[in-house]
Amino acid sequence: MSKVGELHDAVKRGDIATLTALLEADPGLANARSEADARGTFPLHVAAEFGQAESARVLVRNGADVALLDLENDAIALCWAAFFGRPGVVSALLDAGSDVNQRNKHGLTPLGCAVGGTRGQGQKFSNATLDDWRKAAEMLRAREGKE
């Protein structure tokens, strides 16, 4: 497995020790796009999808760019966190300055992604509860997020 693959795997599992060691050895990995994921994800997108808030914080502290867009939807990681109902990651990304009103290629903001996530598609791929989506949406609204 490549170093990028190892990093993405550590983020997905929430393996902070491995994540930290990989970033110390190569800080550029914080913004390394996956070669294996056709969606074109970056480490913050992986943290968002799998609800790994501490991984997101470690990545941000090590230079991860919260404005990077995936290839599939031109979406920032905040939109992914909202879509998958991950309030801990939403909080971490908001604290890092992620744009609460950045639209993806479908015209959805992170708040729109949170609302969309509760309407079936996000629920297919996430173990989040409706309360998780509500919390994420409330955080986005509190930062003046628009749909």
What are these regions (language model features)?
Residues 18, 54-55, 88-89, 132-136:
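Conserved ankyrin/ankyrin-like repeat signature
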Residues 2-7, 33-43, 69-76, 103-116:
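Ankyrin-repeat boundary/"N-cap" motif
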Residues 23-29, 57-65, 91-99, 138-146:
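Ankyrin repeat domain, specifically the short helix-to-loop turn at the C-terminus of the second helix
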Residues 41, 49, 131:
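Ligand-binding pocket scaffold of soluble enzyme catalytic domains
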Residues 9-14, 46-52, 80-86, 113-127:
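Ankyrin repeat A-helix N-terminal signature
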Residues 75-122:
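Ankyrin-repeat and related helical/solenoid repeat scaffolds used for protein-protein interactions
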Residues 1-6, 96, 115-147:
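Ankyrin-repeat-protein effector appendages
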